[in-house]
Amino acid sequence: MHFIKIAVFFIVISLLFTGCSVTTPKTTETTSPSVPPISSIRAQDDFYGYVNLETLQGTTLEYGQTQAGSFSNIDTEQQLLDSMTRIVSSSEVFPDGSCEQIARDAYLQYLDFQADEAAIINACHAVEAELDKINNVQSLDELMSMAEELRTDFGCVTLSNLAVTMDYFNPDEYGIAWMQATDLCGVPLEEVDENTYLAEQYEKRIIDTLRVMGYSYEAAEGVAHNLMLMIIDVAWATNFDIANAADPFSYTSFMSSAEIDAALSHLSVIDFELMAGIHDNPYGGWLIMDKGQLTAIDALFDESNLEELKALVAYDFLAQYGEYITSEHSIYEEYFPTSQESIDLQAIGYIHQIFPLVLSDLYVKAYYTDDMDQQFSRMCEDIRESYRELITDSDWLSQETRVLLLEKLDNIRFVDGGFCLEQMKDDPSLNDVFGANVFETQRNVAMREHAKSIENIGQPRNRLALGRQMHLVNACYGYDNTVTITVAIMGAPFFDANADYFTNLGGLGAVVAHEVGHAFDSSRIKYDANGVYNPLWLSAEDMAALESRNEVAVDYFENSFTVFDVYRVDGELTLGENYADLGSMECITNIASTDDEYILLFENYARIWCELTLNTNVIDQLSEDEHSPATIRVNAILATTDAFYDIYDLNEGDGMYVSPDERISRWK
């Protein structure tokens, strides 16, 4: 197998394209690096570059930007600003509890607050009052009661990582889960686990938190240093395979309260539940991801660590409400710098923070049309039907397994703009959370959300409840077998109601098919037709056949493609996403039939991944991100698609050519 040198549009001193190398002169005192312009790229050598060359050569990064492309070019901020301007300037009386009424009142409250010095000072004093309570704590019991108060009254998660969430073993129910912490006091646990000397750079904010509370610098420094040693202990006990896993929930197990109590040496199950504001647990235990980390955190609860734990609680509280103290505590300004955005955009950001689903509803009403809904619904069903054909024809799997996979396919539910419009209703009770100023409103919203989560305990879970905001450019597959496609991603080049069907199929259709493909990727394949984690739901023989394909796919993506002629993708890390891309392309090409349809589809598929990004970003992505770089998502997928060879007449020797015996498939 020869190595395919993918052309990558990154900001580097030299650009290397398949079949064409740019010789860069060595830098001397009189010469500087230069890149001759590239006028054209052959589709057969680098399809990503062939489609996107002109766009990328005309793209520049603004100051501070690290990338720009199709995803970032959808200007939802301006769309929301336009909608808000219409609402605020309107003389219409909106229904009580409507998204228009709530958004308008929150917007105006934010503007009023920013112009009211007395309100800003009052908010600062309210935060200081809570810090004084933390400062005056004299025992662990008092501190644990303080943690419960902050969780219940401010929505502040501290000392206890318990949360009411989906039961991963039964998505129609809630469960109480101990979530693995990836950081404490802003300290990335994996980073200090590997390099403890890096911990020192994170001590300053802890020191400044304590100085706000009245500690001298010397006293604050001592407490911060001791707290950092405690955090390192937690890092050493943390299983980072979980945090880095494509499917972290596969590490989850249910432990009874008695089993958890037996594992804890300092606190009890009830102690941790009370700190999370949970007074009743009908489940008789918790879902636990990382037992080792839990026991390490439990070991911190010793009276000798009281000052350090107080610092941790104060840090967590100010991480959520610290912006309100900067007017009187300048040392905290660096953590909440003055926004350079317009006051209008700041107000929209505030609404997104406290009323995200209100903003979501507002966006859907303004930008999702009946025509879009009809076209999108048709596309989703075409994609489902295409997957049905692919799975049915996968005779390398047993008939029994294919029936089960088809059942899972049929059970997939789409959460989109049309679904939101069906579920949308006015909620007058939202007016009850408005306080005298934005601080009080933020606190009241947090209190309401916590109370709602507690009410969910013991109740059935609606897996179709909206979890993603429609004003964010996003798409996702949920472990409970739902696919969410936001309205914000339904802009060009992904989707255009006035474009032809196959252009849209290569854009948004590829995204939808990608998310559906996740239902059958290397990790989600362990979840059954009802979205329940059950690695044994398929026969051992068929699971082995699927896993053998995993090994082939890992080899294909690691050994066939390079970035910068040097770096390779991590085939294991990216396997789930690569499989979703692979299944997506097989699905949408299965819908097309003519050369023109394929061309429209292929070109827009390349177009949606168009991005200009810093080379350092891409190098980091290769080691940290489960997604492959954009060029590989295009070229590596098309290089193993037979129809692509026919349309563009690929032959041995072309940059993207892969011999037939080395091409891979998800379903064929």
Where do the model's predicted regions map?
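Intrinsically disordered, low-complexity linker/terminal regions across diverse proteins
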Residues: P356, D361-K668
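Bacterial N-terminal signal peptides that target proteins for export
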Residues: M1-A7
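Active-site-surrounding "flap" and adjacent substrate/cofactor-binding loops of secreted or lumenal enzymes
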Residues: R42-D46, Y50-E117
